[in-house]
């Protein structure tokens, strides 16, 4: 079973992602609401994929956190964001091992991206 963590500052949205991931056969190892919680969680678990928002509570954005994660380990990151700002989209595309979907998230789109990540 594939393992995931969710890094999202909105609890209800995080819960929805958990349900979607579990319905696709993922084991959700934990959730974090801030960059600091995410760092703690990543020291405790080893996910196969990270589902993350671009904008987080705490000192770091999702983009900064992804860069730090990839400096230590190559865990794919799927950004789920409402932002369509060109600079954000460009920054995500420049990060190796990252992809994004725009909120609201369609279950089929989520599944397609997760399948592509699993194949790589």
Segment roles from a protein language model:
Residues 64, 84-102, 112:
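Alpha4 helix (beta4-alpha4-beta5 surface) of REC/receiver domains from two-component response regulators
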Residues 106, 115:
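Receiver (REC) domain switch/active-site region of two-component response regulators
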Residues 80-81:
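Hydrophobic/aromatic residues positioned on beta-strands within the core alpha/beta folds
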Residues 63-72:
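Short amphipathic alpha-helix used as the core "switch/output" element in two-component signaling
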Residues 53-54:
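Active-site residues of response regulator receiver
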Residues 34, 60-64:
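Acidic catalytic/metal-coordinating carboxylates
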Residues 8:
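Conserved acidic carboxylate
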Residues 11-30, 95:
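Two-component/phosphorelay signaling modules centered on CheY-like receiver
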């Amino acid at each position: 079973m594939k393992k995931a963590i969710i890094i999202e500052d909105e609890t209800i949205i995080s819960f929805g992602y958990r349900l979607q991931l579990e319905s696709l056969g993922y084991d959700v190892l934990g959730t974090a609401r801030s960059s600091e919680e995410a760092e703690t969680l990543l020291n405790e678990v080893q996910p196969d994929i990270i589902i993350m928002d671009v904008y987080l509570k705490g000192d770091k954005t999702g983009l900064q956190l992804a860069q730090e994660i990839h400096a230590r380990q190559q865990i794919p990151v799927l950004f789920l964001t409402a932002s369509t700002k060109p600079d954000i989209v460009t920054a995500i595309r420049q990060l190796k091992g990252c992809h994004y979907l725009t909120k609201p998230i369609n279950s089929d789109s989520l599944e397609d991206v997760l399948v592509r990540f699993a194949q790589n």
